[in-house]
Amino acid sequence: LPSGNEIGVRYSAQLFMGDGRGPEFEAISIDYARYNYYNIGFRTGLNLFFDDEVCDYYSIPMQFTWRTERIRGLVFPGDGEAGSWVAAALLSIIPKQFEAHTGFTPGMMLGPLSREPYSGNFLVKHRFSCTYDLGVRLIIPIWRFNLYGDFTYHCYLTDNFGFAYGDYRPGRSYMELGVGLSFNF
């Protein structure tokens, strides 16, 4: 498509990685991306996190992206048998475009600091947060719409979480798994 703008909505979960434990989040995101020459672009938006232990958490991703051209012409040369129809159906749902992104995501955790957690063991130590992000997006284009799966590694650069009981320090590495729908214009 000749246009280079994209707006989308995504649901995701951030899962703790590594040794020990850490709070896990669910998020709804609205984002905007602009692509220029050579499919290099910039993506930003608003992430709204939902978690009982952390309260309200909002962040704004600032990511540089690179996207491949759409892969066209994946057609299975079938002979009309049932097996060829199955192969054609499978080829129609594989991703036909890929994106790599990296950047930083500053955010703000609202609500009282160091309060007793609702349903867990973690306390918010500092309101401001910042993560370094590195990820890929697998895209299934449908006309001007994109269905996608998003896999992003986040490393918290700020020390935001404390353990309510003891001196244990939660890890800072998270893997975000998301699905979304975007529109190109």
Identify the role of each PLM range.
Residues 1-49, 184:
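Short glycine/proline- and aromatic-enriched beta-strand/turn motifs that initiate or cap beta-hairpins
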Residues 54-57, 132-185:
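Predominantly the C-terminal beta-signal and adjacent terminal strand-loop region
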Residues 10-12, 61-69, 180-184:
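Helix N-cap / beta->alpha transition motif
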Residues 11-15, 117-122, 161-164:
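Extracytoplasmic loops and strand-loop junctions of Gram-negative outer membrane beta-barrel proteins
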Residues 30-122, 126-132, 140-145:
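Gram-negative (and chloroplast) outer-membrane scaffold detector with strong preference
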Residues 7-12, 97, 103, 107, ...:
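Outer membrane beta-barrel transmembrane domains
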Residues 5, 11, 26, 32-36, ...:
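Polar/charged side chains located within well-ordered beta-strands of beta-rich proteins
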